[in-house]
């Protein structure tokens, strides 16, 4: 879907605060409420807007550890392994990557014990040859609201 300037402005408003009313977005963008509603509907139908949610402070929820885990998978079973890993509620992202490893996992944990259990579960999965886990010391930026 091609986005024009109005679409981008609407999206920026939604990214700023998804609770903005259509009337508020229309006022901010300088278009009618009908335009805002129809553009949002088109972007939802096209799959550009996948949903609306709150942005949580994970540390305040007790998730003290963020990890980046590289995995190497054998026998061409990468997609199967990734789908299984993605089911874990602590996993925030699973990515195919280039380089020495096959995939990267971003996950958050409340304790070292939880991280240890997760690592053991990974190594118990068929076709995982090895893992390499990096514990994040400081999060400088974590924001997936791109536009």
Q: What role is predicted for each listed range?
A:
Residues 1-147:
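A compositional/biophysical signature of low hydrophobicity enriched in polar/charged and small residues
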């Amino acid at each position: 879907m091609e986005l024009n300037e109005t679409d981008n402005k609407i999206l920026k408003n939604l990214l700023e605060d998804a609770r903005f009313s259509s009337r508020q977005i229309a006022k901010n963008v300088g278009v009618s409420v009908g335009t805002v509603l129809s553009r949002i509907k088109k972007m939802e139908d096209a799959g550009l807007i996948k949903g609306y949610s709150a942005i949580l402070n994970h540390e305040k929820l007790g998730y003290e550890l963020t990890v980046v885990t590289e995995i190497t998978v054998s026998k061409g079973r990468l997609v199967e392994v990734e789908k299984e890993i993605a089911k874990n509620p602590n996993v925030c992202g699973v990515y195919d990557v280039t380089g020495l490893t096959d995939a990267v996992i971003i996950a958050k944990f409340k304790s070292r014990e939880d991280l240890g259990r997760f690592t053991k579960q990974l190594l118990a999965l068929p076709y995982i040859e090895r893992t390499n886990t990096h514990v994040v010391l400081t999060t400088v930026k974590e924001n997936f609201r791109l536009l």
